Swiss-Prot record:
This is Succinate--CoA ligase [ADP-forming] subunit beta. It comes from Rhizobium johnstonii (strain DSM 114642 / LMG 32736 / 3841) (Rhizobium leguminosarum bv. viciae). The keyword Cell membrane does not apply. HAMAP family: Succ_CoA_beta. Substrate binds at N274, G331, I332, M333.
Amino acid sequence: MNIHEYQAKALLKGYGAPVAEGVAILKVEEAEAAAKSLPGPLYVVKSQIHAGGRGKGKFKELSPEAKGGVRLAKSIDEVVAHAKEMLGNTLVTAQTGEAGKQVNRLYIEDGADIARELYCSLLVDRSVGRVAFVVSTEGGMDIEAVAHDTPEKIQTIAIDPEAGVTAADVAAISKAFELEGAAAEDAKTLFPMLYKAFGEKDMALLEINPLIVMKDGHLRVLDAKMSFDGNALFRHDDVKVLRDETEEDAKEIEASKWDLAYVALDGNIGCMVNGAGLAMATMDIIKLYGKEPANFCDVGGGAGKEKVAAAFKIITADPKVEGILVNIFGGIMKCDVIAEGVIAAVKEVGLKVPLVVRLEGTNVELGKKILNESGLAITAADDLDDAAKKIVAAING
């Protein structure tokens, strides 16, 4: 689960991190009062969407010459003018795709005197089985480009979970950042604090880009991105309330209600599979035969008829879907249950696109019999390769 920048900063501020004063607004009418509550005279007006690249982004409704989703303002009137242009419009960034995202919230923040911009993130480094700091002196820009063009400028410092962030770890991170003076002193409290927040809140990612050294020598968190482990949200009611469903795909929201592992993609073949590995293999073979998957959908091993039907309805609700491939290997999951769920969903929502079903495993013959006797236009497949060929051929006509 992702949250907005202003929410992430409020959470970090609760741990004692140095962040600027700021106010989140939902209406243009709130912009003037928000700016007046800040020290000024420099302000930053930031679009709040769950995507990076906001500063370089462009608004669909504005001219190509218009400023992006993060703007400086040198007066309160300028803050209001920016708010009028940004709120309610669609921001397109490198991460949103062509559709972009509507800006429903702005964060008006006090400006900062920046001397240096750094990149700092915490994530789970699965290669060593530890939480690690990923740091670079090249902050405030596209870290993916830095990793591609100058990977030597990115360093990773893994943290021993038993010891936590030690003085030696802080020294290593500070050295990587080339910190000195007041910034090096700030580091002694900031980095252990970030590690503590990451662990206590069950984060999957904490990204600060940029972490700045101000002209007075001190550190400040200028931007913050947080992603939380969805499987751990049951013990974080304070985090769950921060969820903004308007930023999420409606199909993914519905899938979460049924405990389905569903991710919307850009292709045209809907997939319903049991098991993440088989789901990825199914998507791979669709690509092998020249098409793209419209989704990742793992119904899990113990799904009942209702859950299968819900998954099928979510897939068919995607207007991009031109065909559906159901690929089930029944172990815990029984093939007859899958068949009954698919038929129930088809009878409810109709079948307007080709449907290919491959069943194997527990109760496979019963599952095939149920499908054959349903009277529905369902194409059976013998194996995964056969299934992929048939759904691609059906779409190609």
